[in-house]
Every structure is written in C-alpha cells, then in structure tokens.
Amino acid sequence: MGTTPSGTHIRKGDTVRLSWRSNCGVYGTWKKDEKVLAHGGRVSISHKDFKHFSLEVKDARQEDEGNYTLELSNRKARVSGSAAVTLLEFDTEWRGLFLAETDEVKKTLEAFKVSNSEVRCLRFLLQGPVGVGKSSIINTINSVFQGQMVNLTPTDAATGKSHTIAYQAYPIEDAQKKSLPFVFNDIMGLENEKESGALIADIISALKGRVKDGYKFNASSALTETDFHYNSAPSLADKVHCLVTVIHANNIFLFTEEDDAIQKMKQVRKAARDLGVPDVVFMTHVDHCCPLVKKDLNNIYLSKRIKAAMQRCSDLVGVPMNCIFPVKNYHQETKGDAKTECLILHALDKAVKSADDFVRVKSSN
C-alpha cells in the first residue's frame, strides 16, 4: 500500500493520500480503525478497473489519525495492507511560547539580584550524555545577553566522546562584558558505558561544592580529599544551586531505562534531591526532532513529536513535564533569532527562580 508523499506523518489541513495497485481484478474495501469508510464529504474513494485503489481524505484533522486498511479479495484469495496516519501537530498549543515577553524576561534576568547575600552568583551544573549540547547552551545564553555570537566554551559533536575534560565555571556576561549573577559549570559527558565518562562520585562532589575549577575528570578514579582540587570547606556560594540535565530531543527515543547514561542521570538527580537542590531539563536539538519545528520554531508547542520527547524524558529520567524546557542552541547562525532567544530565556528564567528559591531557603536555616 502506498502512503502520503511525506510518509504517514502529515500536517493539519493536508490531504491524506493512500493507494494500492493489484496485478489482478479484485474487490476492495477501505477501513479506518476497523470501521468501513464510504465515499463522500472529505473522503474520496476510487476503484479503477478493479486494480487501482486510492483513498483521499481532504483537510486532515485530529479525527483522521489512525490505522487505514485496504482489504482486497476475489474468489481465490483475500489480502490486506495498512498504513498508520499521524498528524504532526495538535489543534492548539499545549504550552505558550510567549514570544512577546522575551525582552521583558531578558531585562528581568539582566537586573536580577540573588536573594541571599552570601551568594554572589547562582551556580548551575550541566549534566547529560555526550553530544547533547551542554557547552553550546553556555555559548547560546552568552550570545543572547551579549547580542552577538559567542563561543566561550569549546564544542565537538563529531567524536562521540566527551569534549569537556576539566571542571570549569563559565560566567554569563552582558553586552558590556559585565558579569550577570549566573555561573554555569560544565562537566564531562555521561557516556553510555559504565566505565566511561564522568564518574557519579565526581558529579555528586561537584553538587556539594567540593570540586575546584581546573579539576580534570578521570573515568577510572574519582576526586579524593587529598587532591589539590578538593574543596574541604565549601561555602554556600561554592555549591550547586540548580542541576540542569541536558537531553537531545531526538535521541531520547533511543534510550531505555536500563541504559547506563539514564541510570547515571537518575543517580545524580537522586543525589541532588537528597541535598535539596532543584533540577530542570533543557531539551536540545528540537529542530532535529520534528520537521514542523525545523521549519518554524513557532510550532514548538504545537508539535506532537516534541511533546512525546518531553514525556519520554519525564518517564525515563523522572523530571516532571513542567520542569522540562525544549530549547535550540545556536550552531551555524551568525545573527540572533527571536524565537531561539525566547525558548532559552524562558528556560533560564525557570532555572534561576528555582536556584534562587534554594539559596533563599538556605539563608533562613
């Protein structure tokens, strides 16, 4: 059985086109989800010479999603073929993009002051598998606030191995190179092998503020109390105030609960939870995940694929849906984009509020 030109995934308002050609005379019956379809209205059925069978459903709607089957029969045999038709988008947004609020959110973050005088900068720790764009998130956020493309942190998605080898804090600066009260710590990627990538013990030490800048990750041994880069008396300012898990929107469908990378992320989340540290997810590469979003980021919260990726992430890692934020990093762009900035700023705003709540509670204890 043939399918629509773009496969079985179509946009709302498109025409569903399915066809079949038989090499002998047969009778045909079209069904959708086991219910017989009849010619009329938006449904057009054509049987030509008892050999060519076609079905068109115009102005596709949510109700047209389903499994379409053509049953063919003659005196000698009975066969059938099926095609699943899926609409790429919902009728309405399932979360607001709030593009008009982007400038206001940016100004609020630029003027932000930490609510605890013991802490000059809120500290965010990025964790996630190799190649998800952790370093690119830091570059993208700095690009937004500086008004130009910034490559503060090295990135390399081609090797399949972590490009980050040392623990380092990266400041966020505005257009005048003034540091904003946010610092991002990047770590070695979590590889999908038990003995590769950053060690859980090192990440937990980082959460506790026990890892100094410059510490080089070692997949075979964790930081010890005798190490030069071990902080034996971390202050609240040294500790992580929000854990940011970074997930590739398309690759999340390739993971299972048993995968080492997923297990590592869950262990780190549990450690953060035990410490009272809040956590969020930044879901990257949304343009690779859905053709609608690749065409226009305005479709981000109409996309069924993006919502499915977020739900899959929630199921695997355990983060609530309202703490998962789809974002797009700058990659090949040379100029800023309002929709890209809207997504990353709203994600950062949520992370900042969560981190500030954490340090405020600590000040009252």
Positions of the model-derived regions?
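Extracellular/luminal immunoglobulin-like beta-sandwich modules
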Residues: 67-90, 148-157
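N-terminal pre-Walker A segment at the start of P-loop NTPase domains
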Residues: 88-118
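Core motif of extracellular immunoglobulin-like domains
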Residues: 20, 29-31, 70
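Switch- and interface-adjacent substructures of P-loop NTPase systems
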Residues: 116-118, 141-277, 285-305, 318, ...
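Short beta-strand segments of immunoglobulin-like
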Residues: 4-10, 43
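Glycine-rich phosphate-binding P-loop
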Residues: 122-146
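Extracellular beta-strand/loop-rich beta-sandwich domains predominantly from IgSF
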Residues: 41-76
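Structural beta-strand segments of beta-rich domains
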Residues: 6, 14-18, 122
